[in-house]
Amino acid sequence: MALTKVRGTGAEGLTLASSAPTVTVTNSMTLTDGDIAFASGHGLNFGSTSDVSGMASELLDDYEEGTWTPEIIGDGGNSGQAYQLQQGSYTKTGRQISCMFFIRFQTEGSFSGSYLRLSGFPFTIKSQPQTVHLTALYFTSLGDNYISLGLQAYEGTTSAFIWGKKSATTSREYLGTSDLTNATDLSGSFIYNI
């Protein structure tokens, strides 16, 4: 088989015509600079790998990193909150979202309703399953004596209820609107699907 060497010059580089849409590389390929850009709806296809019976897709078609703004809200509203720190970051790999957050209150403000939620997720939670346990939380300076906190989210939302336990033998309960203070810290990391 003859070897053909193709060199592109100038600002345009190398362009393949639509009559030759496929390029096959028999060995590895190395980019010394630049990126590989995929058209929308395309990506890395892992179709040559073995699958389990429930496999629905082998195409990794999205990746991004960014920030989000976490906040605590009451299920009936809230006002007057001020945060000393309010940080959130996320990584989206396909349909999976990995989030981290840290909140430090400066002024608690007031909350109405019965329960508190962590709000502002960067993407809406997948419609199934209905209820998702997300993570345990780090916390300090609550207005009540909790020994653990966690997040419980529901389909089609961008927030999660905060729940806790006050002893190892008691049932969990959702944090109420009086359970925070001006010195409360909350932080954690969690994963969900969209």
Tell me the role of every PLM-derived stretch.
Residues 78, 103-158, 162-163:
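Terminal beta-strand-rich extracellular "head" domains
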Residues 94-98:
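Extended extracellular/luminal ectodomain segments enriched in beta-structured repeat modules
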Residues 1-69, 73, 100, 107:
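Intrinsic low-complexity, repeat-rich intrinsically disordered segments enriched
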Residues 31, 92, 153-155:
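Generic beta-strand structural signal
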Residues 159-174:
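Cysteine-clustered segments with highest specificity for TGF-beta superfamily mature ligands
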Residues 99-101, 119, 186-188:
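Hydrophobic residues positioned within well-ordered beta-strands of beta-sheet architectures
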Residues 13-16, 48-58, 67-93, 104-126, ...:
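Surface-exposed ligand/attachment interfaces on beta-rich extracellular proteins
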Residues 182-194:
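Short, structured beta-strand segments at or near domain termini in extracellular proteins/domains
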